[in-house]
Amino acid sequence: MPGVETIKSSWADEVELDYGGLPPTTETVENGHKYVTEYKYNKDDKKTKVVRTYKISKQVVPKTVAKRRTWTKFGESKNDKPGPNSQTTMVSEEIIMQFLNSKEDEKANDPLLDPTKNIAKCRICNGEHWSVNCPYKGTAMDTNLMEKKASAAAAAAVDAPKSGKYVPPFLKDSQKGALGMRGRDDTAAIRISNLSESMTEADLEELVKKIGPQSKMYLARDKNTGLCKGFAYVHFKQRKDAAAAIEILNGHGYDHLILSVEWSKPQNN
């Protein structure tokens, strides 16, 4: 019987047999970098070589963290090297914790320091905006508010002597009434300033007619342009109505401006 001839295999087949199919994973460290080389099969069942490069950096950590990293691993990671294993461990997003002391916590809970809270308060609808920007300005809600304030101011002026409280001098002399040459009570005159240039007599009458009856109104106008100079005088028939007008209109928002209302100073004859 003739002898069986030995067929020599190729070098690649011998290497594949020696490594059991795939070469082992290797790790090398050079110049502060760690290179991990591994082999695997791709979708076409061909061997591929994958090289991962890691940059080695030193980090100062608390003692408890450093001690925890020396704990003995167990389970499937019993024989793993120090550090996370990509096959069994997934590193998630880093979360930074911030600790506040008691003083910072008190400041955070202070309602006055809260930027989300608006310090402005509307006098018409009690909203968190200035009265000049109120969407209900000039509507029935604004008119009702002015009527309520006028009634409250008039009632306070009448009931003040009965209650025994302090009565301003102008209310004490309201019954006397200093009449002028034309029968007009100059002590019941007020001056309204900070009016817009587009102000008209009709607007002025609309502004004060709900407070009380008037005997005369004067809107200062420029002789050349005919525009409002920014102030006006209103003479009420009763001094208590003039006092109510000052209480209601002083600081009131009108036509994107804040009105300033005060008693009219008597002219020196």
Swiss-Prot record:
One of its GO terms (cellular component) is eukaryotic 43S preinitiation complex. InterPro entries: eIF3_g, eIF3g_N, eIF3G_RRM, Nucleotide-bd_a/b_plait_sf, RBD_domain_sf, RRM_dom. SMART domains: RRM. GO terms for biological process: formation of cytoplasmic translation initiation complex. Its main location: cytoplasm. One of its GO terms (molecular function) is translation initiation factor activity. It is found in: Cytoplasm. Keywords: Cytoplasm, Initiation factor, Protein biosynthesis, RNA-binding. Gene3D superfamilies: 3.30.70.330. Residues 188-266 form the RRM domain. HAMAP family: eIF3g. Belongs to the eIF-3 subunit G family. Component of the eukaryotic translation initiation factor 3 (eIF-3) complex. The eIF-3 complex interacts with pix. RNA-binding component of the eukaryotic translation initiation factor 3 (eIF-3) complex, which is involved in protein synthesis of a specialized repertoire of mRNAs and, together with other initiation factors, stimulates binding of mRNA and methionyl-tRNAi to the 40S ribosome. The eIF-3 complex specifically targets and initiates translation of a subset of mRNAs involved in cell proliferation. This subunit can bind 18S rRNA. This is Eukaryotic translation initiation factor 3 subunit G-1. It comes from Drosophila erecta. The gene is eIF3g1.
